C-alpha cells in the first residue's frame, strides 16, 4: 500500500518564540506554528493562560514568564530557549498594550505616564526582543524577526497618540534593522493589523455579545465586504513571513487591513452621494 503524505508542515524543525503568546494574536499564532511543526516558546506575563496553552499544545511547546519591558527577563527568555532547543529561528515580537479603551484621545488629555508605559512595552519590548534574538541568529547566519505593529502606522486618527507613536516606532525599528541584519541572513518584517477583537482590546467589553457587536462594527467600517478580521488572519500572515516561502521577503510592513488604509472614505462617500 502506498502511504499518503500528511499535510506539509511549513515550520518543521524550527524554534519560535512568541511574546504576548498566551492570548489573542499570540495564542492563535502559537497554535498555528505548532501545527506546522515548530517548537514554540510562549512568552507572556499571563502565567495561567500561558501554561494552559503550553499544556494543550504538548511536548513541543513550553511557557516562560517574560515581561518584555525588562531586559533581564528577555535575556532569560532567549537563553532558556536556546538551552532547551539548541537554536532560535523565529522571534515574533507580538506583546503589546493599549491606552484606555484603545480609542482616539485628545493630546491635551493624554498623560505622559501612558506614553512612557506604552513605549516601554510596545517599542522597548520589541527592541529588546530583536536585540537578544540577534545575538543568537547572527551565529546561525539565519533567522526571522517579526513584529506586530498596527494599521495606525499607515493611516492617522484611529488610536490614541501614545499607541500610534509606539507602533510607528516599531515599524521604524524593523526597517532600520533590515540592512544590518540582512548581512547575516536574518529577515525582518512587520505585520500591521486593522482593528480586531483580542484579549488586549478593551473596547470589546465583557461577553460574547459585546465581542460580536464590535466585530460587526469593525467589519462594517472596513473596506473588504463580507469579511471580518480575526486573530487567525494575523497568525496566517506571520506563518507566511516566518516560513521559507518568504525567503526573500524582508523590510516590509505587511498591512493586513482589507485595503482600508488605501481608501479615503470621506471622498468615496462624497462621490457616491453624487452618483
Swiss-Prot record:
EC number: 1.1.1.-
Residues the record lists as binding substrate: 150
UniProt cross-references to InterPro entries, sorted A to Z: NAD(P)-bd_dom_sf, SDR_fam
Keywords for the protein's UniProt record, in alphabetical order: Oxidoreductase
SUPFAM superfamilies documented for this protein: NAD(P)-binding Rossmann-fold domains
Entry binding sites for NAD(+): 17-41
Recorded superkingdom: Eukaryota
Active site, renumbered: 163
UniProt entry tagged with the keyword Phosphoprotein: no
Primary enzyme class: oxidoreductase
GO molecular function, one term: oxidoreductase activity
PANTHER family registered for this protein in UniProt: 3-OXOACYL-(ACYL-CARRIER-PROTEIN) REDUCTASE (AFU_ORTHOLOGUE AFUA_6G11210), ALCOHOL DEHYDROGENASE
Protein function: Has no tropinone reductase activity.
Similarity section: Belongs to the short-chain dehydrogenases/reductases (SDR) family.
UniProt protein name: Tropinone reductase-like 2
UniProt organism field: Erythroxylum coca (Coca plant)
Amino acid at each position: 500500500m502506498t502511504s499518503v503524505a500528511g499535510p506539509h508542515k511549513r515550520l518543521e524543525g524550527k524554534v519560535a518564540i512568541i511574546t504576548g503568546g498566551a492570548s489573542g494574536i499570540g495564542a492563535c499564532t502559537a497554535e498555528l506554528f505548532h501545527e506546522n511543526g515548530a517548537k514554540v516558546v510562549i512568552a507572556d506575563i499571563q502565567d495561567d493562560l500561558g501554561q494552559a496553552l503550553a499544556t494543550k499544545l504538548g511536548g513541543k511547546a513550553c511557557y516562560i514568564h517574560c515581561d518584555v519591558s525588562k531586559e533581564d527577563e528577555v535575556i532569560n527568555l532567549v537563553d532558556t530557549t536556546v538551552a532547551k532547543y539548541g537554536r532560535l529561528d523565529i522571534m515574533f515580537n507580538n506583546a503589546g498594550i493599549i491606552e484606555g479603551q484603545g480609542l482616539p484621545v485628545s493630546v491635551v488629555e493624554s498623560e505622559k505616564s501612558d506614553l512612557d508605559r506604552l513605549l516601554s512595552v510596545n517599542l522597548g519590548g520589541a527592541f529588546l526582543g530583536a536585540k537578544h534574538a540577534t545575538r543568537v541568529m547572527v551565529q546561525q547566519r539565519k533567522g526571522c524577526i517579526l513584529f506586530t505593529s498596527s494599521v495606525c502606522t499607515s493611516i492617522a486618527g484611529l488610536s490614541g497618540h501614545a499607541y500610534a507613536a509606539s507602533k510607528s516606532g516599531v515599524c521604524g525599528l524593523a526597517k532600520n534593522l533590515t540592512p544590518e541584519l540582512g548581512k547575516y541572513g536574518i529577515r525582518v518584517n512587520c505585520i500591521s493589523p486593522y482593528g480586531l477583537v483580542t484579549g488586549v482590546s478593551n473596547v470589546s467589553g465583557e461577553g460574547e455579545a459585546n465581542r460580536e457587536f464590535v466585530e460587526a462594527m469593525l467589519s462594517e467600517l472596513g473596506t473588504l465586504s463580507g469579511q471580518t478580521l480575526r486573530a487567525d488572519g494575523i497568525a496566517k500572515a506571520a506563518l507566511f513571513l516566518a516560513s521559507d516561502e518568504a525567503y526573500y521577503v524582508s523590510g516590509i510592513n505587511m498591512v493586513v487591513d482589507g485595503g482600508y488604509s488605501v481608501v479615503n472614505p470621506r471622498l468615496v462617500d462624497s462621490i457616491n452621494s453624487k452618483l
